[in-house]
Amino acid sequence: MKKYLKVVYLIFISTAAFAQSTPKYSNEFLNIGVGAKAFGMGNATIASCDDVTSGYWNPAGLVSLKDNIQLSFMHSAYLAGIANYDYGAFATKLDDRRALGVSIIRFSVDGIPNTLDLVRNGQIDYNRVTSFSASDYAFLLSYAQKTVVEGLTLGGNVKVIHRKAGQFTTAWGFGIDAGAQYKTKNKWQFGVMARDITSTFNAWKFSFTDAEKDVFTQTQNEIPKNSLEITLPQFILGAGKLFEVNNLIGFRAEVNTLINTDGQRNVLVSSKYFNLDPNLGIEADYKKAVFIRAGVGKFQRELDINNQKVITLQPNIGIGLKLGSLMLDYALTDIGDVSASLYSNMFSVRFSINKRETAK
C-alpha cells in the first residue's frame, strides 16, 4: 500500500512540475460539455450518466444504455452567435456487458477578418480584407464493459483532435480518456473520469506566404513556428444518489469535483500543484417522462465594483420531456447573470431505437 501511495504521489508531483512549462486551457473547447440534460444539472453527471452522452462525460456509463441504439444531437451559440458549438453521438450495446459509442464535437468561429493585406505601400484598401474561420473538431471512439465486481463498470475513449484557423494553421492531436462507475444496491452512484490521461498532444503546423511574413516583420510581430502543444491530465470525481418518493416521483442528486493539473487556475480551491472546481446538480422526475433540473458550478474568485474579493458562481436550470423514443432537453445557463459569463440556451435531442426488453 505504501508503494502504491508513493507512485501516486510521484505522478502528481511530476505532473505539477511539468505544468509549469505547459500552457493552460489547451483544447479548452473539450471542457464545455455536451447534452442539455447535463447543463441543466450544472454538468454534475460523472457518476450518473447512463445514455449516449456518456461517451463524453464518462464512457463507463455506456453499459447502462436502456436501448439497443441511441443517437443524440445538440447545437448552441455563444457570444451572441459569434461562435457555434455542435455535438452528435451514436451508441449501441454490443451485448449485456459491453457497449460502443462514437461522438463528434465541433466549435467554430466564422467570419474572422483577415487584415494582413489591409495596408499595401502605405495605402489602406478595405477591398483586400478577407475572412476565415477557426474551427476545432474532436472525434471520440468509446468502449465500456462490466467487470466481475457487481455494480462496477469501466470505459475508455480514444480521441482524435483536429484544429484549423483558415489557411494559416492546422493541428492534429491524439489522446486517451478512462472512466469508471460504481453503483450500489441502495442507489448510491460513484464515478471517476480521467481525461487526457496520457497527456494529449496537438502538433501545430503554420503556413504563411512571404508577403504575410513581411507584414509580421513590419508590425514587429513574431512569426509563429511549428510546435507541439500538450494537454495535461484532469480528473473528475463524482458521487450521487437516487431517491424514489413513490412510483410516480423520483429525485437524483450529484456532486462532482474537477481536478486540474495544468497550473494555478481561478477556481474555488486553487494552487500551483492542483485545482479543485466543484459543481452540483439535482433532478426531479415524474413517471420518468417529465424532468426538472437545477445545478450550480464554475465557482470563481473575483473583484467586485468596490474592489472587494467575492466568489461568483453559475446557476443553471433545465427541463426534459420524454415522448416515446424521443427525449427533448433544454437548459438555460447562468440564470440571473450571476457570473461574468453570458447566459446561453442549450437544446439537445436524443432518439432511441429498438428498446430492450426488461425483466419484470
Positions of PLM-derived features:
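Serine/threonine-rich low-complexity intrinsically disordered regions
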Residues: 1-2, 209
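Subset of outer-membrane beta-barrel
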Residues: 20-360
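Sec-dependent signal peptide recognition
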Residues: 2-10
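Sec/Tat signal peptide C-region and signal peptidase I cleavage site
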Residues: 15-19
